[in-house]
């Protein structure tokens, strides 16, 4: 089964817009179509991003909804340390390196992202980086 790291922006988008492609990617994981790899740093980033007051107001995000997502991730995803040294891999946006570290530590087959800095890499240490649409097409074809 595919081992996949989803970028934080996809988690956030799937909560904010429940009918889009990011929501479909998360739903495919819930239906056990692939294994999700995640690190504690990515979980913290998801929680932190969903705590922004402007997001909370605009999308009526509650602590309960965030807690449910985090709990699901902690219980069903494969949690890896995300401590691989990937320093300098994304000079334009080093904070995105936590996604690469997670993928390397978790021996991921694929990284899925909407982030242009990550997508521009194309792959990292042999791990392809795809936009969500391509990922869903690949998943449907398998």
Can you annotate each of these PLM segments?
Residues 62-64, 71, 81-83, 87-92, ...:
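Internal alpha/beta domain cores that form substrate/cofactor-binding pockets in large enzymes
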Residues 1-38:
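Short, well-structured N-terminal submotif of metal-dependent ribonuclease cores
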Residues 28-85:
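PIN-domain endoribonuclease scaffold, especially VapC-family toxins
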Residues 20, 37, 64, 90, ...:
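Residues at secondary-structure transition points
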Residues 74-110:
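Active-site neighborhoods of divalent-metal-dependent phosphate/nucleic-acid chemistry enzymes
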Residues 104-112, 116-142:
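Acidic, PIN/NYN-like endoribonuclease modules and their adjacent C-terminal/linker elements
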Residues 6-8, 38-39, 114-115, 131-132:
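A secondary-structure boundary/capping signal
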Residues 14-15, 49, 58, 121, ...:
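Residues that scaffold the ATP/ADP-binding catalytic core of kinase and kinase-like folds
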């Amino acid at each position: 089964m595919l081992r996949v790291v989803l970028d934080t922006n996809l988690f956030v988008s799937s909560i904010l817009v429940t009918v889009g492609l990011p929501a479909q990617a998360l739903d495919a994981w819930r239906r056990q179509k692939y294994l999700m790899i995640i690190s504690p740093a990515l979980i913290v980033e998801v929680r932190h991003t969903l705590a922004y007051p402007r997001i909370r107001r605009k999308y009526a995000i509650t602590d309960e909804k965030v807690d449910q997502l985090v709990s699901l991730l902690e219980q069903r995803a494969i949690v890896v340390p995300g401590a691989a040294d990937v320093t300098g891999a994304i000079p334009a946006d080093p904070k995105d390196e936590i996604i690469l570290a997670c993928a390397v530590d978790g021996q991921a087959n694929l990284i899925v992202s909407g982030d242009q800095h990550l997508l521009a890499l194309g792959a990292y240490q042999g791990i392809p980086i795809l936009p969500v649409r391509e990922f869903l097409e690949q998943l449907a074809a398998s």
